[in-house]
Curated annotation (Swiss-Prot):
GO terms for cellular component: large ribosomal subunit. GO terms for molecular function: large ribosomal subunit rRNA binding; structural constituent of ribosome. Gene3D superfamilies: Ribosomal protein L11, C-terminal domain, Ribosomal protein L11/L12, N-terminal domain. Residues 137-160 are annotated as: Disordered. This is Large ribosomal subunit protein uL11. Residues 138-160 have a biased composition (Basic and acidic residues). It comes from Methanobrevibacter smithii (strain ATCC 35061 / DSM 861 / OCM 144 / PS). It comes from the Archaea. One of its GO terms (biological process) is translation. Forms part of the ribosomal stalk which helps the ribosome interact with GTP-bound translation factors. Belongs to the universal ribosomal protein uL11 family.
Length: 160
């Protein structure tokens, strides 16, 4: 029972049998419409966002399993803030401000795939992403906000 795994990045809820899915899965001879339908059903909550998808295929029986990952942190942040692009000059150009409660929401969504042991550390990881995107957090530089998290200034919001 040999299994192959294909990993692809697809827009949530709108997979099609065309590229990138079709060329990646076509050689395995599985029913593409079943795969597309299952991916779209499982990724519907992430509509409009790029979502990592892992398709495991049994070469002998042509059965497949689909795992939907969470979108990249940058995609979740942009979705929360309603922005289309991050800053071209992250150190100099601030394009938006991420409130601490939204940072916590994103950390909760991504928690299983973060390196953090608790939500406080998860929020700090999200803030780290904000640095490279040219965003502020609660009206300040994300690095300052991280220090505030360490100092306990957001403990009332960051309740687990």
């Amino acid at each position: 029972m040999a299994k192959d795994t294909v990993e692809i990045l697809i827009e949530g809820g709108s997979a099609t049998p065309g590229p990138p899915l079709g060329p990646a899965l076509g050689p395995f001879g599985i029913n593409m419409m079943q795969v597309v339908e299952e991916i779209n059903n499982k990724s519907a909550d992430f509509a409009g966002m790029k979502v990592p998808v892992k398709v495991s295929i049994d070469r002998d029986t042509k059965e497949f399993e689909i795992e939907i990952g969470t979108p990249p942190t940058t995609s979740l942040i942009m979705e929360e803030l309603g922005i289309e692009k991050a800053s071209h000059e992250p150190g100099a150009d601030i394009v938006a401000d991420l409130p601490i409660d939204k940072a916590l929401k994103i950390a909760r969504m991504k928690f299983d795939s973060l390196l953090a042991n608790d939500y406080k550390a998860g929020v700090k990881e999200v803030m780290g992403t904000c640095v490279s995107m040219g965003l502020s957090v609660d009206g300040k530089d994300p690095r300052e906000a991280q220090k505030d998290v360490d100092a306990g200034k957001y403990d009332d919001v960051l309740v687990e």
